[in-house]
Amino acid sequence: RRHFRLGMSDYGAWVVLPALLRQQQALAPGVSFGIVQEPRLETARQVAEGQLDCALGVFPLLPEGVRARRLFEERFVCVCRRSLFDRPDGLSLDRYLAARHVRVSLQDNPAEEVDSALEKRGLRRQVALTLPHFTVAPALLAGTDLVLTIAERILERLRLPEELAVCEPPLAIPRFDYVQIWRGDAEREAAGAWLREQIQAAARKI
């Protein structure tokens, strides 16, 4: 029997964890998992210090000795009431910037991919709400004129209210790699290697 501590947000728990649990039930029913959610830098620090067996997420900066492996590529989409569309396929940049936004971020000082893409063009969005819950955010849009820009896979098993629609962002936001990270000096440990392979296998089924 083995207990693994994994770092991930509710995005990872929603997108990757179901397939991982199905594999674990079939291959290693004695294995258990504990999920920890922290900001990116804190998660990476806990991996580096051995407090977490591995972590899933987006990690632009990694401590020395921490290794990463790509699970899949992800992209952003927008979600809002269909009545906000000012063109047939979604939002113009002017409408997007005039709207108020929901921002999902685990960081104490949010500065994530969407805001970075805007800042590179000298633009800013109006953020009405910042919260750390990917799976909750889409449901908060109903009955409001708020716009959410979110990683696409989070929407695959969510049932959106009829008034909401998904469209492409009106500006180029780079795709990003969703990865798993682990402590390099534990790389040859059999249990950890097994865990990482199971996570890779689960990601291939998404």
Question: Each PLM stretch: what is its role?
Answer:
Residues 3-7, 55, 79, 102, ...:
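Short, well-ordered beta-strand segments
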Residues 11, 38, 108, 185-186:
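Short, surface-exposed acidic/glycine-rich loop or hinge patches that mediate macromolecular interfaces
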Residues 26-30, 138, 143, 151-165, ...:
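C-terminal effector-binding regulatory domain of bacterial HTH transcription factors
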Residues 39-44, 48-52, 57-58, 107-165:
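Hydrophobic hinge/microswitch elements
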Residues 58, 85-93, 99-121, 152, ...:
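Secondary-structure junction motif
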Residues 62-75, 145, 158-168:
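Ligand-binding "clamshell"
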